[in-house]
């Protein structure tokens, strides 16, 4: 299974409770504990200016889209061994679909 469009409102709530403490979405939001996510879709891993990525993130060599995020957000440390992202992941497909749908709207 891969990504399918979800509920943006539910995704916004998930982002607020699971992601916002470490990431910003808005343009010019800047890096926090994690890199800024504005413009995420279509961007290569490990490429936000001013953020200190691990070599694992820089060398992963993928471009973020709905399907790569769907896989990554299930278990970040499995998808990119060596990432410093401490988040354990979203195990439910529906939660990942909702948050990706929201992020796609919020980071465009």
UniProtKB/Swiss-Prot annotation:
Binds 1 heme c group covalently per subunit. Its main location: mitochondrion. Transmembrane segments: none annotated. The keyword Metal-binding applies. InterPro entries: Cyt_c-like_dom, Cyt_c-like_dom_sf, Cyt_c_1A/1B. SUPFAM superfamilies: Cytochrome c. The modification N6,N6,N6-trimethyllysine is found at residue 77. Changing residue 11 to D: In cyt-12-12/cyc-1-1; characterized by slow growth and a deficiency of spectrophotometrically-detectable cytochromes aa3 and c. GO terms for cellular component: mitochondrial intermembrane space. It is found in: Mitochondrion intermembrane space. GO terms for molecular function: electron transfer activity; heme binding; metal ion binding. Electron carrier protein. The oxidized form of the cytochrome c heme group can accept an electron from the heme group of the cytochrome c1 subunit of cytochrome reductase. Cytochrome c then transfers this electron to the cytochrome oxidase complex, the final protein carrier in the mitochondrial electron-transport chain. Belongs to the cytochrome c family. This is Cytochrome c. It comes from Neurospora crassa (strain ATCC 24698 / 74-OR23-1A / CBS 708.71 / DSM 1257 / FGSC 987). The lineage of its organism: Eukaryota, Fungi, Dikarya, Ascomycota, Pezizomycotina.
């Amino acid at each position: 299974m891969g990504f399918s469009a979800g509920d943006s409102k539910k995704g916004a709530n998930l982002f607020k409770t699971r992601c916002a403490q470490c990431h910003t979405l808005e343009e010019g939001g800047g890096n926090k504990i994690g890199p800024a996510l504005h413009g995420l879709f279509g961007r290569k891993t490990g490429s936000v200016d001013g953020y200190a990525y691990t070599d694992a993130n820089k060398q992963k060599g993928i471009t973020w889209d709905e399907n790569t995020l769907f896989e990554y957000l299930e278990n970040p440390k499995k998808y990119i061994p060596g990432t410093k992202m401490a988040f354990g992941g979203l195990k439910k497909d529906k939660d990942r679909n909702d948050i990706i749908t929201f992020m796609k709207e919020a980071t465009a």
